[in-house]
């Protein structure tokens, strides 16, 4: 009996010790995340390899940007608190930043969820953005997020990630340049129902993380997929803010996105190099004073302003996205070369050719006129920047206006009756190279700027530019006024007017110093308004250089 009593006492003591040890372990597990130390039991349960590893419990770094869709589980939103949520589905972007905690297998998560196409078009408030935080239990691939209370995080991990992510930074850049201005965005946010949602709703997201392999750019990349459910129970009553919706998003390969931006800058560099070659060809085509005077200074100035804007845009993008600075700075440098060296030099030569020459003027007069030219050019440059900022919502019509740079040359050809001012290669080459950037931005469905493509606008731009180039080519081959009715044209001086056939004497051409036989065909000689006679070929070649009479230096009308 004594042995049985001792055995019962020992058994009861061992059972009590086991219960006390179990309660102690449970209490230890209820400590805060940041204060709980790693235990031997945790390492045994979740495995010692938290980073890397190929086992079933290997940690996945889910920090990144995810793009996908959202959809209401019901046909329509059944909430009466926010009836503006009328659309059934739309696009979404999820930004997540994770950091390890002292509990093995649990990561702290911060981020934001952006819902596009939430409201009707009549509200025009853009996407709804919600800041979230929670935990990621990586052994079970479970993600739990709730709406952030709005207080600033101590770690700053989310801000550091967004400031170093080229996808996020270039999205901000393109939204300010091509989509909406900061002032409009702030006004939309003030009137957005999203603020009421943050006040009256609790956002809860439960998601599962899965892994998939993508072979983009000839390389296998691990991509993560988020599939989950988002619910929004109300704070003050039992009515939900909106119906439950499903989330489905896939991680973005930042390396592929980076390569897209680099390829774009290579395209801009190549296009700029082609434009330099075309400008050199055109400058050789109009290397005389008469040839340069036929070119419209407004046409060259408009192209120079366009290239200066592109230089500033690429330089700003390179400064904003530090990891892409070298690529964008190279593109900006080539645009600066096109603008400052070649186009400005050509603009000055045109200005000098069209400027009336007076014999008694001094250097002060020329310097004053040159400074006036530069002040007008840079005044238009700065004024254009202010106008584009003010009328930011009308960027596409403004681009159509900027891409009408051939129209001043067409009008100048008709007014002056100029003969072949531009080389055909320059017309075709500039038309094609100028279309490269807008067609990429507004036509490529997967451009790195994330601008919504518009096929109709791209077709309109190509047709508009093609029409201008076609008119210039018609003027080149069939005459500057070939499409203008003769009734509307002023009377034109004829260099092939009839001579007095009773005059049977020969005259000398002062250009080639040979005799002109007036008894031959009338088309073999040309007569100026000042009654001087020259060979037709000699005077035409002379007028390609100077529009002055070789004998008396009087101005000559266009032929």
Curated annotation (Swiss-Prot):
The chain crosses the membrane at residues 260-280, 295-315, 319-339, 371-391, 395-415, 424-444, 459-479. Disulfide bonds: none annotated. The lineage of its organism: Eukaryota, Viridiplantae, Streptophyta, Embryophyta, Tracheophyta. The RING-type zinc finger domain is required for E3 ligase activity. This is Transmembrane E3 ubiquitin-protein ligase FLY2. Residues 281-294, 340-370, 416-423, 480-559 are cytoplasmic. A zinc finger (RING-type) spans 509-553. GO terms for molecular function: ubiquitin-protein transferase activity; zinc ion binding. Highly expressed in stems. Expressed in root xylem and seed coat. Disruption phenotype: No visible phenotype under normal growth conditions. E3 ubiquitin-protein ligase that may be involved in xylem development. It is found in: Endomembrane system. Residues 30-259, 316-318, 392-394, 445-458 are lumenal. Its EC number is 2.3.2.27. Keywords: Membrane, Metal-binding, Signal, Transferase, Transmembrane, Transmembrane helix, Ubl conjugation pathway, Zinc, Zinc-finger. Residues 1-29 form the signal peptide. InterPro entries: DUF2921, HRD1_E3_ubiq-ligases, Znf_RING, Znf_RING/FYVE/PHD. It catalyses: S-ubiquitinyl-[E2 ubiquitin-conjugating enzyme]-L-cysteine + [acceptor protein]-L-lysine = [E2 ubiquitin-conjugating enzyme]-L-cysteine + N(6)-ubiquitinyl-[acceptor protein]-L-lysine. The keyword Transferase applies. Its main location: membrane. CDD domains: RING-H2_TUL1-like. It is an enzyme of class 2 (transferase). It comes from Arabidopsis thaliana. It holds the Pfam family zf-RING_2. It comes from the Eukaryota.
